[in-house]
């Protein structure tokens, strides 16, 4: 008997669900276009060496690769679209002068499951601002994310802002032993003050830096910026990341973005993001509906160095939020993947 089931972690999208995702993508591209972003379409397959340049070593396990029968080249199914944008930007400086504002949508496929009930093929829509640095570009991305979440109809969306280098500066100043660094970052991701304090006690840095390490777990919520300023006074290496964050927030707030939270103890994206990071949340979504940040090191890997910042919206999580809070889309909720499959993130978006 013919087995009509799909491979693990994949699913079909029926007409109603497909129409809803298409509507979300269309609304997002309306906003992207108003901000001056131009749409590009990119292939599902890339040469493996191109994909590898855009991912961290840990993320390479998410890549599905095979030998292309015609050419014998090793190719990969894209686990992320940003490396493709970087490759395009480097390959076509004639058509894409700096700064370039590009937007996209499409599926990405990951090899590993990240959480039960989530498919490995994920539909995204996103933007990349290439060749522009500084607080103005950071704020542009923040404002665009906030406007995008509002445009798709999410109720009470919230943007959370961090900085990849703030916690890193404190950790480095504390001079933790090599054997404890990974555990300290894991503890920070759990907001585990006790574990952070235990690791910091074995550091060889200044007393001020060692005392600041467990405080990183509390740099969210009301008063987070005040607590971060106190840390930056004690650990001067953290002052520049804090100043960059506050500068972007000031501009974004002048442009009308009000629902912004801060978490400067965010550990996500270490080794990939180089500056401000952000995530978009909405009541009813199982996780962040969007993630992004500044990744100034990526473009140089493709031969056209420069600053870059962007974000991607997870259309499935946005759909969930609309269904559960706004009461829209009833009857088109995506079917849960079997226990055999799930989703894995190729990088920190």
Swiss-Prot record:
Pathway: Amino-acid biosynthesis; L-histidine biosynthesis; L-histidine from 5-phospho-alpha-D-ribose 1-diphosphate: step 1/9. The keyword Amino-acid biosynthesis applies. It is found in: Cytoplasm. Keywords: Amino-acid biosynthesis, Cytoplasm, Histidine biosynthesis. CDD domains: HisRS-like_core. Residues 327-349 are annotated as: Disordered. GO terms for biological process: histidyl-tRNA aminoacylation; L-histidine biosynthetic process. InterPro entries: aa-tRNA-synth_II, aa-tRNA-synth_II/BPL/LPL, HisRS-like_core, HisRS/HisZ, HisZ. GO terms for molecular function: histidine-tRNA ligase activity. Residues 330-349 have a biased composition (Basic residues). This function is generally fulfilled by the C-terminal part of HisG, which is missing in some bacteria such as this one. Belongs to the class-II aminoacyl-tRNA synthetase family. HisZ subfamily. This is ATP phosphoribosyltransferase regulatory subunit. It comes from Anaeromyxobacter sp. (strain K). The lineage of its organism: Bacteria, Pseudomonadati, Myxococcota, Myxococcia, Myxococcales. The gene is hisZ.
């Amino acid at each position: 008997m013919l087995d009509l089931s799909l491979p693990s972690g994949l699913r079909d999208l029926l007409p109603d669900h497909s129409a809803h995702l298409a509507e979300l993508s269309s609304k997002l591209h309306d906003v992207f276009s108003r901000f001056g972003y131009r749409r590009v379409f990119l292939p599902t397959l890339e040469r493996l060496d191109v994909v590898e340049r855009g991912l961290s070593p840990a993320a390479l396990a998410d890549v599905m690769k095979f030998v292309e029968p015609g050419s014998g080249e090793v190719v990969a199914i894209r686990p992320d679209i940003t490396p493709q944008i970087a490759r395009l930007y480097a390959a076509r400086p004639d058509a894409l002068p700096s700064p370039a504002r590009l937007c996209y949508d499409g599926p990405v496929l990951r090899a590993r499951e990240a959480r039960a009930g989530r498919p490995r093929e994920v539909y995204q829509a996103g933007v990349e601002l290439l060749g522009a640095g500084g607080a103005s570009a950071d704020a542009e991305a923040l404002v665009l994310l906030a406007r995008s979440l509002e445009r798709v109809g999410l109720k009470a969306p919230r943007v959370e802002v961090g900085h990849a280098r703030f916690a890193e500066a404190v950790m480095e100043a504390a001079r933790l032993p090599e054997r404890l660094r990974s555990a300290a970052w894991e503890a920070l991701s759990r907001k585990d003050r006790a574990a952070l304090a235990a690791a910091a006690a074995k550091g060889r840095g200044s007393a001020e830096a060692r005392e600041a390490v467990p405080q990183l777990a509390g740099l969210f919520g009301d008063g987070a910026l005040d607590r971060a300023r106190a840390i930056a006074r004690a650990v001067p290496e953290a002052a520049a990341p804090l100043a960059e964050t506050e500068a972007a927030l000031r501009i974004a707030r002048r442009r009308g973005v009000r629902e912004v939270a801060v978490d400067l103890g965010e550990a996500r994206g270490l080794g990939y993001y180089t500056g401000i990071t952000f995530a978009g949340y909405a009541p009813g979504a199982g996780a962040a509906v969007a993630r992004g940040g500044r990744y100034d090191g990526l473009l140089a890997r493709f031969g056209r160095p420069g600053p870059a910042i962007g974000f991607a919206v997870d259309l499935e999580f946005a759909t969930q939020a609309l269904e559960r809070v706004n009461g829209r889309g009833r009857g088109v909720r995506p079917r849960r993947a079997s226990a055999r499959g799930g989703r894995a993130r190729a990088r920190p978006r």
